[in-house]
Swiss-Prot record:
Signal peptide: none annotated. It comes from Chlorobaculum tepidum (strain ATCC 49652 / DSM 12025 / NBRC 103806 / TLS). It comes from the Bacteria. Binds 1 lipoyl cofactor covalently. The modification N6-lipoyllysine is found at K65. This is Glycine cleavage system H protein.
Length: 127
C-alpha cells in the first residue's frame, strides 16, 4: 500500500497536503480507500466557495459497488475542484497526485499537524 511521507491522514482514509503558501491544501482519498472502494465511476463535491467544518462532508465518491462520503481533514473553504475528475478513474490510478479531489483554503493550517502521521496511518490500516 502506498502511503507517502509528505502527507497527513485521517481515520476516514482522506489525505491532506499543505501547499507551499502554508494556507491552502490538496485533499484526496488514500490508496487504501480507493482499493477498498473498487472502480470509482463518479466523484461529486460541494461547489467552490463552500465552507466545510473539520470532519464535515465535502462530497461523495461513487464506485461500482458503493457510495462513500468524503470528509474534510480540516476546516476551510473549497477554492478549487480538480477538473481532471471528469475521468473519475484517475482517483484509482493516481490517488495522491492527479487524483486529488479538492483544494481548500484552511481556517487554521496548524490543524494539519494534529492529523495522523504516515506511520500512524500505516498502523491504522494494518500495514
Amino acid at each position: 500500500m502506498n502511503i507517502p511521507d509528505n502527507l497527513r491522514y485521517t481515520k476516514d482514509h482522506e489525505w491532506i497536503k499543505l501547499l507551499e503558501d502554508g494556507l491552502t491544501a490538496l485533499v484526496g482519498i488514500t490508496d487504501f480507500a480507493q482499493s477498498e472502494l473498487g472502480d470509482i465511476v463518479f466523484v461529486e463535491t460541494k461547489p467552490v466557495g463552500t465552507k466545510v467544518a473539520a470532519h464535515g462532508t465535502f462530497g461523495t465518491v461513487e464506485a461500482v459497488k458503493t457510495v462513500a462520503d468524503l470528509f474534510a481533514p480540516a476546516a476551510g473553504e473549497i477554492v478549487e475542484v480538480n477538473a481532471g475528475l471528469d475521468d473519475a478513474a484517475i482517483v484509482n490510478s493516481d490517488p495522491y497526485n492527479e487524483g486529488w479531489i479538492v483544494k481548500m483554503k484552511l481556517d487554521n493550517p496548524a490543524d494539519v499537524e494534529a492529523l495522523l502521521s504516515p506511520a500512524d496511518y500505516s498502523a491504522l490500516i494494518g500495514e
